[in-house]
């Protein structure tokens, strides 16, 4: 069924395929255009540099008049990310407008890596370390980056059929 939300999401998908902003990618699930997997690469010159952070975006039929529900699937240590992966970002709540699309949502989240807002913390520990103990904050973030790589490698291994193990002629 074609609805305004679904048509808009297909336009968002076309934009992501043809002109995705640097460091972000996203696409709908093959069987559900209302649910998207996304990835943000940690920006250069930040503690998150080269991390591969996965997100889930869930839209309803009110999109783009209502923001999607967005959360990190990857472990994230950040002042503006709750332990459950939900993100404290004004455009996902009270400052949402229908002009935002998937690309702008992801670039806004990516900008939090450059410029966390410890004044409005979702993770008090991360906010405190960011403000008062920057080296400890950076250490924790870098551990999260390494975990993101391990998760990617695990996902790659899970996707392998390991057929060549059965072909050994020892």
Curated annotation (Swiss-Prot):
Its EC number is 2.3.2.23. The keyword Transcription regulation applies. Residues 152-170 have a biased composition (Acidic residues). It catalyses: S-ubiquitinyl-[E1 ubiquitin-activating enzyme]-L-cysteine + [E2 ubiquitin-conjugating enzyme]-L-cysteine = [E1 ubiquitin-activating enzyme]-L-cysteine + S-ubiquitinyl-[E2 ubiquitin-conjugating enzyme]-L-cysteine. GO terms for cellular component: chromosome, telomeric region; cytoplasm; HULC complex; MUB1-RAD6-UBR2 ubiquitin ligase complex; nucleus; Rad6-Rad18 complex; RAD6-UBR2 ubiquitin ligase complex; UBR1-RAD6 ubiquitin ligase complex. Keywords: ATP-binding, Chromatin regulator, Cytoplasm, DNA damage, DNA repair, Nucleotide-binding, Nucleus, Sporulation, Transcription, Transcription regulation, Transferase, Ubl conjugation pathway. Residues 4-150 form the UBC core domain. One of its GO terms (biological process) is meiotic DNA double-strand break formation. Its main location: cytoplasm. Residues 148-170 are annotated as: Disordered. It is found in: Cytoplasm; Nucleus. Catalyzes the covalent attachment of ubiquitin to other proteins. Plays a role in transcription regulation by catalyzing the monoubiquitination of histone H2B to form H2BK123ub1. H2BK123ub1 gives a specific tag for epigenetic transcriptional activation and is also a prerequisite for H3K4me and H3K79me formation. Also involved in postreplication repair of UV-damaged DNA, in N-end rule-dependent protein degradation and in sporulation. Belongs to the ubiquitin-conjugating enzyme family. This is Ubiquitin-conjugating enzyme E2 2. The lineage of its organism: Eukaryota, Fungi, Dikarya, Ascomycota, Saccharomycotina. The gene is UBC2.
